[in-house]
């Protein structure tokens, strides 16, 4: 009888502790449907306008300075244009300074991303979001006015320290006569700077996808029109119709020869939904853990006292 009572009390305490833990570990971030205006002020609770969507919440990014040993900032977890989650509105320089479970991205430095913008199509100019860059003659063949012309391109080191080409209309390896085994970016996707997305974007591209050089030239001209009209942020010049992105930046895709551009809205929604779910799973609050330990600890102590009776 005594053993049955102890077992019953143990089960009751365990259920109560788990329930209390689940209530205490509710995610601190909340999903917002629109982007904010970037501000380096930590308490402003806004994200960089290069985000397609973002979460807003207390991510406990420690800022260390001479006056304050550690300050918890209100930060944005941003799903940015390169389909990678990163922290913004935070001065953290390394992943170790971010006290947030399982997110592998580090905080973006404010100064590295505040001037994010689409690149111009003027030769020899680089996007202002690059933290460092150099102009190089890539001998990138651009189809204009009925013939191919050589172009110059910028090799850019961006805030995440990935290298990529900008201001170049090359679409595959065969168009690039350069020692780097990378693909020149077409202008509409110059803002996509992740190597993972970069590689998968052209992974299924083949020159045979275009029926003729003329069709290729027309396609490039059409996409240049999108840049000029400000539509570049909504489309991708890809033959990939279905691309799945995970929160860590990896991706996979399938080819559809009839698809000339894919909208970013659906991909952004899917990815932000995935990141949201991941955030809800991973954002285990310290309060919830403490409540679990406290509840379970009291139950264990009670069982110990009863066992002595």
Swiss-Prot record:
Keyword Glycosyltransferase recorded: no
Membrane-topology annotation of the record: Lipid-anchor; GPI-anchor
One GO CC term on file: side of membrane
Location(s), subcellular: Secreted, Cell wall; Membrane
Protein name, entry field: Probable cell wall protein PGA50
Family: Belongs to the IHD1 family.
Sugar-bearing residue positions: 67, 115, 248, 267, 277
PTM description: The GPI-anchor is attached to the protein in the endoplasmic reticulum and serves to target the protein to the cell surface. There, the glucosamine-inositol phospholipid moiety is cleaved off and the GPI-modified mannoprotein is covalently attached via its lipidless GPI glycan remnant to the 1,6-beta-glucan of the outer cell wall layer.
Job of this protein: Probable GPI-anchored cell wall protein that may be involved in cell wall organization, hyphal growth, as well as in virulence.
Keywords: Cell wall, Glycoprotein, GPI-anchor, Lipoprotein, Membrane, Secreted, Signal, Virulence
Propiece span(s): 287-309
Signal peptide start-end: 1-17
Domain of life of the source: Eukaryota
Location, primary (coarse class): secreted
Keyword Thylakoid: no
Lipid modification (GPI-anchor amidated serine), residues: 286
Region (Disordered): 241-281
């Amino acid at each position: 009888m005594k053993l049955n009572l102890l077992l019953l009390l143990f089960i009751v305490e365990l259920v109560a502790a788990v329930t209390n833990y689940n209530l205490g570990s509710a995610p601190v971030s909340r999903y917002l449907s629109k982007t904010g205006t970037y501000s380096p002020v930590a308490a402003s609770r806004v994200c960089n306008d290069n985000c397609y969507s973002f979460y807003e919440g207390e991510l406990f990014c420690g800022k260390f300075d001479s006056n304050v040993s550690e300050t918890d900032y209100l930060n944005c977890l941003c799903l940015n244009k390169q389909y990678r989650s990163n922290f913004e509105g935070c001065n953290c320089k390394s992943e170790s300074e971010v006290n947030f479970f399982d997110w592998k991205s580090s905080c973006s430095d404010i100064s590295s991303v505040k001037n994010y913008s689409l690149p111009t199509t003027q030769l020899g100019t680089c996007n202002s979001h690059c933290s460092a860059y150099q102009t190089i003659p890539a001998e990138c063949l651009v189809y204009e006015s009925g013939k191919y012309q050589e172009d110059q391109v910028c090799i850019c080191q961006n805030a995440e320290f990935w290298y990529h080409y900008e201001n170049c209309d090359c679409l595959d390896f065969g168009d690039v006569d350069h020692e780097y085994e990378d693909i020149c970016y077409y202008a509409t996707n110059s803002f996509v700077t992740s190597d993972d997305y970069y590689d998968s974007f052209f992974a299924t591209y083949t020159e045979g996808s275009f029926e003729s050089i003329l069709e290729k030239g027309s396609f490039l001209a059409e996409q240049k029109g999108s840049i000029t009209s400000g539509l570049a942020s909504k489309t991708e010049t890809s033959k990939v119709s279905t691309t799945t992105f995970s929160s860590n930046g990896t991706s996979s895709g399938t080819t559809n020869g009839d698809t000339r551009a894919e909208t970013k809205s659906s991909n952004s929604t899917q990815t932000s939904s995935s990141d949201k779910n991941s955030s809800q799973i991973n954002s285990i609050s310290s309060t919830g853990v403490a409540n679990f330990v406290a509840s379970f600890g009291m139950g264990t102590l009670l069982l110990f006292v009863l066992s002595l009776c």
